[in-house]
From Swiss-Prot:
Ligand binding (NAD(+)): G10, A11, S12, G13, R14, M15, D36, G99, T100, T101, S123, A124, N125, M126
Binding sites annotated in the UniProt record for NADP(+): R37
Cellular component aspect of the GO annotation: cytosol
UniProt protein name: 4-hydroxy-tetrahydrodipicolinate reductase
Species in which this protein is naturally found: Burkholderia thailandensis (strain ATCC 700388 / DSM 13276 / CCUG 48851 / CIP 106301 / E264)
Disulphide-bridged cysteine pairs: none
Length: 268
């Protein structure tokens, strides 16, 4: 297999640096581009400087040049930036791996439409463990559809800007679909004041922000006389980076299509 020519968006961020480290360590991948935001003080620096390595790839804000050199773009940034990168990927026929969270439904529709022209994987969480957890939740939701209240509790570091997390929403969507519902019709986001008794048909969400928590997610099925908790905890972003590389490998040889990590892992 020829080496995958990969570019990283958000290259100076926490996740971007983890992705660069993973690409540099992968025997089947070559780092050919590192995107950063316009005005970043890191522009022009070597993408491997934080590792004490010289990669020969400088951080740039020139998306057109990066897409002209790359076959794959891995993007864990913000929705608005990802959509700009998506347009460039469409122009240059670059495969996309998107781990960005916080998209609106119209923005998600843009991603799905792009899958008709290029190959892309979009997932709110690239971790293999999280995606196996989704299958467990699908099974559990069907067993506990009656008589159990469902709550999703997530915790992340103080710098995370969206809530609930994309992973928590993905969990909610999985549970809702498994029980024949739409999450839009049954989600309750936080509670305050006199809320009245809990509606048993709802799925509740609670978000915690603090410290350097990488990502903890617990789904609680609370019945009478028992509680079942399914929990996934991320100790580092390594699992996300390795999952993103696995997604890129999955796209090799595919010209178009909209996929997620369930497709990548063969869990459908």
């Amino acid at each position: 297999m020829s080496s995958m020519k990969i570019a990283i968006a958000g290259a100076s961020g926490r996740m971007g640096r983890m992705l660069i480290e993973a690409v540099l360590a992968a025997p089947d991948a070559t780092l050919v581009g590192a995107l950063d935001r316009t005005g970043s003080p890191q522009l022009g620096q070597d993408a491997g400087a934080f590792l004490g390595k010289q990669t020969g790839v400088a951080l740039t804000d020139d998306i057109e040049r990066v897409c002209a050199e790359a076959d794959y773009l891995i993007d864990f940034t913000l929705p608005e930036g990802t959509l700009v990168h998506l347009d460039a990927a469409l122009r240059h026929d670059v495969k996309l791996v998107i781990g960005t969270t916080g998209f609106s439904e119209p923005q998600k529709a843009q991603l799905r439409a792009a899958g008709e022209k290029i190959a892309l994987v979009f997932s709110a969480n690239m971790s293999v463990g999280v995606n196996v957890t989704m299958k467990l939740l699908e099974f559990a939701a069907k067993q506990f559809a009656q008589g159990y209240d469902i709550e999703i509790i997530e915790a992340h570091h103080r710098h995370k800007v969206d809530a609930p997390s994309g992973t928590a929403l993905m969990m909610g969507e999985t549970i809702a679909a498994a029980t024949g519902r739409s999450l839009d019709d049954c989600a309750v986001y936080g509670r305050h004041g006199v809320t009245g008794e809990r509606d048993p048909s709802t799925i509740g969400f609670s978000a915690i922000r603090g410290g350097d928590i990488v990502g903890d997610h617990t789904v609680l099925f609370a019945g009478i006389g028992e509680r079942i908790e399914i929990t996934h905890k991320s100790a580092s972003r390594v699992s996300y980076a390795q999952g993103a590389l696995r997604a890129a490998r999955f796209l090799a040889g595919r010209d178009a299509g909209f996929f997620d990590m369930q497709d990548v892992l063969g869990l459908r």
